Amino acid sequence: MPPAAVRRAPYRDFLQPALQRRFASTTGFLLALAYVEAVTLSRWNHLFWPWFPIGLPGIRTLAIFGSILPIIILRIAHSHMGLRTSNSPIDTIRRTAFSLATLETVITFAVSAWLFSQTYLFSIPADSNLGWITYYSGDRARLNERALFYTVNLIILGIVQGVIHISLDYDRMLLGRVKPRREGDANDRPPTGWEKFTEAAPAVVVRAGMLSMVVALVNYVVLYHFLRRWAWSWALSFFRIFYNLPKSNIPPSQAPWSLLMLGRSIWAGFLLCLLWYVADMAFRLQLGKEPLKNNQPLSAESKDPNGSLLNGLKSKKTRVSAFAMWELALIARDFDARRQAIFEDIDRKDGPMWSQLYVTCLSVLKAVEERVDNYGKPPTPPPAPAETAPQQPPPRLVQPPKDDNVWAPTAPPKGLRGAVGKVVNNVITSPGKTPAEVYLPEAKKRALEATDRILTQEQKDMLRPENVNTMVHTLAFKVLSTPTIGPVFQQLFGRRLTTAVFGQPYGEPSIYVNAAYAVSKLAVSSLAEDRYGNVQRDVPALIRTFTTIIKKLERFRDTLPIHWTDLRKTRECAEVEELLDALKDGLGELVTAFSPYSTDLRLTRADMRLAREAAEKPQRAAEAPAEQPRVPAVENGAAAAADGNAEPEMRQLR
């Protein structure tokens, strides 16, 4: 009896638990931060109870954590792979502004802010007079506008943060890129998540304080004046259900504004923004961790590690395939035993493990080549359905019915009477020229005469089509040069090149970078580890494919025209340059390793010469003048987006 086949567990069976563990650790960290904020809101009239978790601080901690819980759910539901690709920010706004995801995000942040505002109001001591209901004289209840002011301020802060969250695409999962280890940095280890967090913590605190201060000042000076009557009416309608409040919806004549209220609102907003930003950073650091468990690849726990990894690489879901490609690149660089197992796995159903990895990685890289080749071409129409032969009707036993038009008028009578009737009909139905044909030429003539009498020669010259076009272009350039509005409409070269190379609506550069490194590193390692010689058959095609893709990418980058709205006029694109660097590094290692065997591999001198030329990297502009103006960090987001650990404020609006 043959042994039972080993079940190949899908790669997602190992990836999903790892992501869930990271979500859980992030949630625990946020719970600890909620406890710290709960302690800061305690009234320190005792040495023990203000911080003891079993008591009011614990209840307050759960309430604060409940305000951040909708954001955690939102991040889990809306997280996606790849950067948003579009030619300009206005294209992104048009695509996402009125989508359901945008509406959910803004509402979720507003709800989170409202929950935190109520927790903050109930945590403040009673002598601060921040309760919703107050009693001025006797037992008559009155609505306290102080509480209304704090609530409105934090809800506005939530709406603003929701817009920022969508604009800077905080839902994107940032994955790492595996790069070759150079001589001298073999012992260097990447920074841990905690080291990254402590390094970025000061910037997070500053961002939280700045956003809270700006929103509080704008609300204090401008917004609350317009929202006051509506918010007062809504609050009265709600609290009349529980209290005997006045029937008048007119707010008090004097609003209770003071510098103390402004300071309290800034502090409350700072605590809330700190929760949001720390949650965002924790999610990015946790979800951007390498696909390892106990310093081993995730698929190592499978009974068939290579099969599970191959399942992930062939997955249709971008998240699964991206993590699997990242793991393959790590295996190619750091795990000798797994790399050896790949070369020795030759008895698979669909071919040796190396052959399937080779085809998968090259199909990923050739997708870039295909997009470049098809750029600017009309989409291929779907194939027409095959024409079927018409069925022959059965023979008729009787004559078919006539197909003449039964509603057609009868033929006019012939003779003198018919001729006279035809002439009369033509006279009646063709009375002459229409009013437009009669009066329109005369109106044009009168308008030209009036123009000659009223306008001067200079004014006539200004109204010529070429001068009007010049005025329109001048106005357009003035709008594009505006620092606040102009960048929204500019089609920068980097954005257009990224969109063309990585596709729409999302493109994940790490998949292509890791694929280029993994397949080239495995091929180079096969010289010492491939006992069966399966890899050498594919090396010539691999070198030629890398050479072709590099040449096409560089030609496309150098020939893509700069759009007239691009005022920078620079051919810079960090994402595409990073992909080119990965391809050049891989091709350079292939040429160096297999150059002595080029004749045996049937690689001609022309092939090797073209490969060496393609693998050469241009000299970077290290001697650039120091006084060159620095591009603001918010706009220069391409380089930051290419870095998996870039701060969100360093990203551009995509």
What are these regions (language model features)?
Residues 148-164, 214-222, 254-289:
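Alpha-helical membrane-embedded segments
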Residues 244-245, 349-510, 515, 527-632, ...:
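Acidic, serine/threonine- and proline-enriched intrinsically disordered linkers and terminal tails
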